[in-house]
Amino acid sequence: EMLPKRDKQTVMNYLDSLPDSNNIKVVTMDMYRPYREAVYECLPDAAIVIDRFHVVKLINDVLSDYRKTLCKQLSAAEKKEINSVQKVLNANRKDLTANQNKKLGYIYSKYPELKMAYDLKEEFREIYECTNRRAAVLKYTKWSRKVKQNFSPYISITETVNRWSLEIFNYFDHPY
């Protein structure tokens, strides 16, 4: 539902106006704190699920920022090379064509740190292929350790997931 404002009070007023709001069992949303606060106050028995699209978008955004930071250190020709795979880096590995894989292989041979960033992005995305919460939390925990040891640009992702872990992992109990 689209509301005129995104503030907590507007959301609370909307939730309070819903008929039979006590029958609402699950609310799906993005990671906007006022929404979470409003739902917890107005619908205390409802489970909040963070839409997986928003979670995966976070890591794609950080990967894109990392690529841009890397480009700042490179020549114009090297920047052009890396920027030529920008969309491919955001794609899921399983959806890549042979030509895209070949192009990435070449880029990775020159910029192994970009391969690390992509591989970690894909590992994170694969969390959503888990069939239950326990497996997802375990996979995330392993991923998080790897990030802390090997790739600091994704630390912000771990901080966000930790802050929203209940709502993110509720996805595995209510996969919407």
Q: What does each model-found stretch correspond to?
A:
Residues 5, 12-49, 56-57, 76-176:
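Acidic/histidine-rich catalytic cores and adjacent linkers
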Residues 55-76:
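Short alpha-helix plus adjacent loop in nuclease-associated cores
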